[in-house]
């Protein structure tokens, strides 16, 4: 019987647009991709709001998706594997390069000037195939600006403060060239997930393709 994999997207992203590439991580498995906008429906209760997530064998969560997943950790089934890509546990941590004030400013800005705001994030995500970057931008521009703003507000006002119970294997991938989630911040996730295996990708930025594949 095939394993079930769920993919939880980052802010302004839908990992499903890269399905053909990403399923290579486990080609024999059944894959379900959850877009950012779907995460925003109940970002602290993913196991309730996303049908089938509780029965998944593996959950891959990228950026914003990882924060939502960890905030929902009380409902994580025993033995469920997590793969966290450039995870966020405290976006405005003093070592992360973001302040609450800056993120709140971007939250206001994205509703008035969506493309310049997205471009400022794109610059921080590191190098990747140009077609991958173009697909991300094209998808993000179609999203509701108010939902994007709410996502930024959520990022700067929610964090994981206590270590999470070890219920299953957890692997963390982070990129040395990621300027959106700095490596120093990614490494600090060991305070929240002390049993997690941390893997640095020296030539990777923020993109799931270069982090995981």
Language-model-derived ranges and their functions:
Residues 180, 198-213:
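Catalytic histidine-centered segment of alpha/beta-hydrolase-like enzymes
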Residues 165-166, 172-174, 178:
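Short beta-strand/loop motif that positions the catalytic acidic residue
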Residues 91-137:
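Helix-rich cap/lid subdomain of alpha/beta-hydrolase
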Residues 1-44:
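Conserved HGGG/HGGXW glycine-rich cap/lid loop of the alpha/beta-hydrolase fold
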Residues 74-109, 148-156, 212:
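Flexible "cap/lid" loop of the alpha/beta hydrolase fold
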Residues 60-69:
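Gly/Ala-rich beta-loop-alpha elbow adjacent to hydrolase catalytic centers
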Residues 16, 179-185:
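Conserved alpha/beta-hydrolase "acid-adjacent" motif
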Residues 134-161:
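Hydrophobic, aromatic-rich cap/lid helix
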């Amino acid at each position: 019987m095939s394993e079930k994999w769920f993919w939880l997207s980052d802010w302004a992203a839908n990992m499903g647009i890269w399905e053909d590439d990403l399923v290579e991580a486990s080609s024999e498995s059944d894959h379900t991709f959850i877009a950012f906008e779907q995460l925003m429906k109940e970002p602290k209760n993913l196991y309730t709001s996303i049908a089938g997530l509780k029965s998944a064998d593996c959950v891959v969560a990228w950026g914003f998706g990882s924060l939502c997943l960890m905030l929902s950790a009380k409902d994580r089934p025993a033995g469920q594997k997590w793969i966290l890509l450039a995870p966020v546990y405290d976006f405005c941590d003093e070592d992360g390069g973001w302040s609450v004030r800056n993120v709140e400013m971007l939250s206001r800005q994205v509703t008035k000037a969506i493309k310049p705001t997205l471009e400022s994030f794109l610059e921080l995500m590191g190098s990747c195939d140009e077609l991958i970057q173009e697909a991300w931008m094209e998808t993000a521009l179609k999203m509701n600006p108010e939902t994007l703003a709410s996502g930024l507000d959520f990022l700067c006002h929610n964090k994981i403060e206590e270590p999470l119970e070890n219920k299953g294997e957890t692997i963390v991938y982070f990129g040395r060239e990621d300027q959106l989630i700095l490596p120093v911040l990614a490494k600090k996730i060991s305070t929240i997930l002390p049993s997690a295996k941390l893997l640095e990708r020296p030539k990777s930025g923020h993109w799931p393709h270069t982090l995981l594949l």
